[in-house]
Amino acid sequence: MTGSRATTCLMAQRRTDRLALCVAPAMTRTSNHHAVIIGASVAGLFTARVLADHFTIVTVLDRDDLPEGGTARKGAPQGRHAHALLAAGQRTLMELFPGIADELLADGATLINFNEGRWYQAGGYRSKINKKRAAISASRPLLEHHLRRRVAALPNVQIRSSVAVDGLLYDGRRVRGVQVCEDGTLSGITGDLVVDCSGRSSRASAWMEQIGYPTPKVDHVKCEQVYSTRIFRRSPSDMDATFAITIESPADGKRAAFVVPIEGDRWIVTLGDRFTAPITDEATFQAFALGLPAPEAGHVVTRAEALTPVMNHRMTSSQRRRYEKLRRVPAGFVTLGDAICSFNPIYGQGMSSSALQAVALGRAVARHGIADTELPKGFYRQAAKVIDSPWKIAVGADFAYPETTGPKPIGTNLVNRYMARVLMATRVSPEINATMLEVQQLTSPPSVLFRPSFIVAVRKAARQAERQMSDEPAAPLVPAAAA
């Protein structure tokens, strides 16, 4: 499926999602207002697009020498690994950038359907669902390339690379811009709103302390996630699925695998583990894939031509800066994306959360006005609501592993026991699997999983799944003639 047919499919899916995307109406730009965004990341680019509707001028500053095409940025080494926009993020992408789905597909991205993939979890494969769920699959660098191109084409947006932000300009009442270093020279850039989208390593707390404001409490959940990736040439004979996900049950191990198609007729294969060293050599990469409880990753890495060496990355903890709990925050300055909350990447929530936070910022600007000193507090309250659901999902799942440490939500052990039953039920119930998928894709809140009628259905389906469990081998993914 390509071209306008793909857009029609994705738009139809978007209309059926339960939660409507509310993009704030654009304000009339009657004054010469300037927004300065730190970081041309996914978060920064979504933010630039949203604020372009509210500000006369939007300037995006990035310390990297930004690439022209779809290659990974130096400042985003995680971009070499498998990424996904969840349904909520994809919906936001299409609302803010009409036609970008066709542009991505024309540049080699793949349209995949959930029912054409294989998702192994809780000791078995999750069932097919009763409605089509399409998604665009591409590398993160390709997505960033198209976002940069679309944002740079906006008449009131400028993206400047190789510009490092060293601090805030503050007049005693509000932030008035940023201090930058460009070509070895320090200078200032004034603005009515500064948005820090510089990522997990954000220096916003230090900057706030320098101008006399308290710094946010930081929640660290130590998950010690490591992941290793190789890219392979893609052939239809590799497996009879458009993508594959394998996640071991916590009782059995900590391993996971993601096999997804990307542009250039390639597979990106990312293997994840916890509380261990990342894979660095080809033999260990192959042995890991072959040792998983489902065969898809092993089939691809042994049958397909490898195009890259093993690339690895480590993330020691998820972290959430609690700006919404501060009584005093500087006017004219907010943080967004990983600068607020950096999730365990294994759940794929980061880019989608950033997109939704950008929309929340647009709503806050429309409600409060650019000059309102209450704008930052209003935004942080809305951002916290965006972050709460994926944070609960990720942190709850992380605490299924006894080595995880950090602030543990009350009732986590009980919830995790119930979630194990939900995942068991997804093996036999398309309805339960569809609801679980909506929660994981951030289009429904986790609370839907705890409705009395749903709990009853889970109890029944989980018992059915247990009765059906057997030692039968998984169906072969590669025709015998291709073996």
Task: Outline where the language-model segments fall.
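N-terminal Rossmann-like FAD-binding beta1-loop-alpha1 element of flavoenzymes
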Residues: H33-V60
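Short beta-strand to alpha-helix junction loop
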Residues: A84-L85, N130-R149, R203, I279-T280
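N-terminal FAD cofactor-binding segment of flavoenzymes
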Residues: V50, G70-G117
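C-terminal helical "tail/cap" subdomain of flavin- and related membrane-associated enzymes
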Residues: G362-A483
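Predominantly flavin-linked oxidoreductase catalytic cores and closely associated redox partners
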Residues: L154-F288
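Extreme N-terminal leader/targeting segments of oxidoreductases
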Residues: T8-A35, D53-F55, L66
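FAD/FMN-dependent oxidoreductases across multiple families
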Residues: S137, Y227, A277-V386
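Helix-loop-beta segment of a Rossmann-like dinucleotide-binding subdomain
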Residues: Q121-R140, L271-R274
